[in-house]
């Protein structure tokens, strides 16, 4: 359907043999997202960055065969994930909310920190997401709630998936917007008349943050690194005058504490280290002592 209406998506294929999988990866390159034909909450999914990881994961997942096909998708690094939550009636969008993930795409939407309204999306990105969402709603003749997840990188927009149901972010965007999306969706499904919300309601002078609650400290040998498997056990929603204010409220709400003396910085590669310099200087001005793993090893 997406090909027919001219909407882009990451390259993917349902494959039934190791030969087919290798041929597909030769075409798109690593990294790739590997998953069984149907998964829930990211279970049994994995991002493979090289041949060794691919073979190890496929042995754990299942035997690849015509009875057990594996879907392999191109994984786009350093892309932003954007969500469209909407209610449509007879294929026409009645109300919508576009939110952005703070983490790069690759973190399960149930674990990701989400901000609404979006604060760092290009105007053209938002415009294209609206247009594609209208196309999909019309093509599927949607009447009710739906959620579309997008990849956005340099105004290049790709559809990850479309779910014809209310998503976990529906209550969050409803509360931030003060528009009950579920009430609208219920009226649509019952065939009752629905009025489109006034566009002025979408002009907010505050920011909402949805953050996830984790239980890593209570689970022995739990991996705290977030990925495509959902690991959170709850979530909070907070509102602030800007992103920083709302994020701070959210982090405190899920149990993080503001450090008193030192801050450990785990910064990754050289570019990420350079990107962290300004934040480290700000922490230093506030009286904190930034510490790196290199510094810890030296002492």
Stretch-by-stretch model annotation:
Residues 1, 5-6, 28-31, 40-42, ...:
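ATP-dependent carboxylate activation and anion-phosphoryl transfer catalytic cores
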Residues 1-8, 14-17, 23, 27:
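Conserved N-proximal alpha/beta basic substrate-recognition cap immediately N-terminal to
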Residues 279-284:
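Surface-exposed amphipathic alpha-helices with a cationic face
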Residues 291, 295-299:
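Residue-level detector of conserved catalytic or cofactor/ligand-binding positions
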Residues 274-278, 296:
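Short, charged N-terminal beta->alpha structural module
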């Amino acid at each position: 359907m997406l090909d027919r209406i001219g909407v882009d998506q990451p390259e993917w294929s349902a494959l039934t043999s190791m030969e087919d999988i290798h041929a597909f990866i030769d075409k798109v390159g690593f990294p790739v997202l590997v998953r069984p034909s149907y998964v829930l909450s990211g279970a049994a999914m994995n991002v493979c960055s090289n041949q060794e990881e691919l073979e190890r994961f496929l042995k754990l997942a299942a035997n690849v065969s015509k009875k057990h096909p594996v879907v392999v998708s191109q994984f786009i690094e350093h892309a932003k994930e954007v969500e469209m939550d909407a209610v449509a009636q007879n294929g026409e969008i009645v109300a919508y909310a576009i939110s952005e993930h703070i983490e790069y795409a690759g973190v399960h939407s149930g674990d990701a920190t989400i901000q609404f309204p979006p604060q760092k999306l290009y105007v053209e990105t938002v415009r294209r997401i609206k247009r594609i969402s209208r196309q999909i709603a019309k093509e599927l003749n949607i009447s009710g709630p739906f959620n579309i997840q997008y990849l956005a990188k340099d105004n290049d927009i790709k559809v990850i998936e479309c779910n014809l149901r209310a998503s976990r972010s529906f209550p969050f965007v409803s509360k931030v917007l003060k528009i009950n999306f579920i009430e609208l969706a219920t009226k649509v499904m019952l065939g009752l008349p629905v009025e489109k919300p006034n566009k002025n309601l979408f002009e907010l002078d505050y920011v909402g943050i949805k953050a996830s609650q984790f239980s890593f400290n209570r689970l022995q040998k739990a991996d705290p690194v977030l990925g495509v498997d959902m690991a959170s056990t709850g979530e909070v929603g907070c509102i602030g005058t800007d992103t920083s204010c709302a994020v701070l409220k959210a982090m405190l709400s899920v149990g993080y504490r503001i450090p008193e003396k030192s801050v450990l910085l785990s910064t990754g590669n050289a570019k990420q280290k350079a990107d962290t310099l300004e934040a480290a200087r700000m922490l230093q001005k506030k009286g904190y002592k930034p510490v790196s793993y290199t510094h810890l090893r030296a002492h």
